Regions:
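Short beta-strands and strand-loop turn motifs
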Residues: 25-28, 51-58, 84-88, 195-196
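Accessory recognition modules or surfaces
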Residues: 146-147, 159, 203-217, 233-241
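PLP-dependent aminotransferase class I/II
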Residues: 11-16, 110-194
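Conserved PLP-binding catalytic core of the aspartate aminotransferase-like
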Residues: 176-177, 185-218
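Active-site pre-lysine segment of PLP-dependent enzymes
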Residues: 18, 35-48, 60-84, 88-120
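PLP-dependent aminotransferase-like
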Residues: 1-54
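PLP-dependent enzyme catalytic core of the Aspartate aminotransferase-like
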Residues: 68, 216-217, 226-257
């Protein structure tokens, strides 16, 4: 089996695929296009492709692929007999997540959508996620291949409780929408290249020594040098509260001076 991934993207796709014995083929996104997924990625899907992964928005770039392009990618997968896996685990941070979701394309038996409670609701340790798919035969195979009792009763209870936290989710979405441009513009004011992301994180380019300089000051940035398609000059930072974002910008100004 062969799977096609954009690069850079979430590293665990490749790790899981290789563990299952799949061959991983990467389509390297262009830096000059801010690592956006374009029609070139669709053209990379061929008859030898069994599965395609798309992170929406992409991790670590934060780039959001337009739904029309996702639909075109799905049609290409259908024509080639491939499955399209769309990871929407970070999409819920966007106020318009339902409009941007690929759910409206679920009539296709070639589409799988991955979702998670752990990101938006800040409970990663619960390990609670799910998939959406209209292909019953495929779902049966997935269930047969999975572990019995894969979701604990505590995780189920946490997930049900999270669904009632609509006010909390709205506050988080509002915070991200408000603070993302503030943090982005602040980073750019320091002379850093920052991608126009749509997620609750931003990817920016800085001296490779930046991470080591910040650590003694109590700030840890995600170095993205281990992502295929990126080097050690790329960093990802979360969009946090206004005081935390300002503290980051203040410290960066001191370190980069």
């Amino acid at each position: 089996r062969t799977a096609l991934l954009p690069a850079p993207t979430f590293a665990e796709y490749a790790a899981a695929l290789e563990t299952a014995g799949c061959t991983v083929r990467r389509h390297f996104l262009r830096e000059i296009e801010d690592f956006a997924v374009t029609e070139a990625f669709i053209s990379a899907v061929d008859e030898d492709t069994d599965m395609v992964f798309l992170c929406q928005p992409n991790n670590p770039t934060g780039q959001l692929t337009p739904l029309a392009l996702v639909e075109a990618l799905l049609h290409r997968c259908e024509a080639c007999g491939a499955l399209l896996v769309v990871d929407e685990c970070f999409l819920d941070f966007l106020p318009q997540s339902e409009v941007l979701s690929a759910k409206k394309l679920l009539a296709s038996p070639n589409l799988i959508i991955l979702k998670a409670f752990t990101k938006l609701y800040g409970m990663a340790g619960v390990r609670l996620g799910y998939c959406l798919c209209s292909n019953i035969a495929l779902l049966d195979k997935m269930q047969a291949a999975g572990q019995p009792w894969a979701v604990s009763s505590l995780a189920q209870a946490a997930g049900l409780a999270a669904l009632d936290e609509t006010a909390y989710a709205a506050r988080v979405q509002e915070l991200i929408a408000e603070q993302r441009p503030v943090l982005r513009d602040g980073l750019r004011a320091l002379g850093l290249r920052v991608l126009d992301g749509s997620a609750n994180y931003l990817l920016f380019q800085a001296p490779e020594t930046l991470g080591d300089a910040l650590r003694p000051r109590g700030i840890v940035l995600r170095s993205c040098g281990n992502y295929p398609g990126l080097d050690g000059s790329w960093y990802r930072t979360a969009v946090r509260t206004a005081p935390e974002n300002q503290q980051l910008l203040k410290t960066l100004q001191e370190v980069l001076a």
